[in-house]
Amino acid sequence: MISRGEVRFNCCESTLMRIDEAHRLPGFDVNVMRIASNFGGGVAGWGSVCGAVSGAAMALGLVYGTSDDEAEREFSEKRKQMRTLTQELMNAFEEDWSHINCYGLLGCNTRTPEGRAKYDEMKAKGLLHCDEYVQWAERKALELMNIKQ
């Protein structure tokens, strides 16, 4: 994870920041970071889609996503390309890591006291792989964008 001073960014924020540092993302700004701040831990700590995957998907959206100024055909083509790339990202992550949800990746439900205790214990022992997920997601997103690393 990326840290700046005492601030430690979550998996989603860290993934977006790493991708933006490697290849400037169009439209990446404080508002994107505000959105990403709620996607760590599988969306607000809920255990859903891994924040690293969410961050990479957001980066793909910034590059290939739609806005309200395209003609219908261009809108549809962009949407199709973005979804194809994002699904490739998600399939590859699940293939490499066996799960795509934080709950499965961590092996515990951090929304329960028992799960939170297990998570804290694994974190203290350095058994979490979240930094690896962030690095993987950055590499895969750049690969999908055809950016040389």
Task: For the regions a language model picked out, list residue spans one by one.
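A short glycine/serine-rich beta->alpha loop
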Residues: 1-6, 39-48, 76, 122-126
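Thiamine diphosphate
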Residues: 6-12
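Amphipathic alpha-helical interface segments
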Residues: 12-22, 57-59, 74-149
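A broad structural signal for alpha-helix termini and local helix breaks/kinks
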Residues: 19, 23-26, 43, 64, ...
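Short, hydrophobic/aliphatic alpha-helical segments
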Residues: 26-44
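Active-site nucleophile and cofactor-binding loops and adjacent substrate-binding regions
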Residues: 32, 47-52
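Catalytic phosphate/nucleotide-handling subdomain of diverse soluble enzymes
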Residues: 51, 56, 60-66
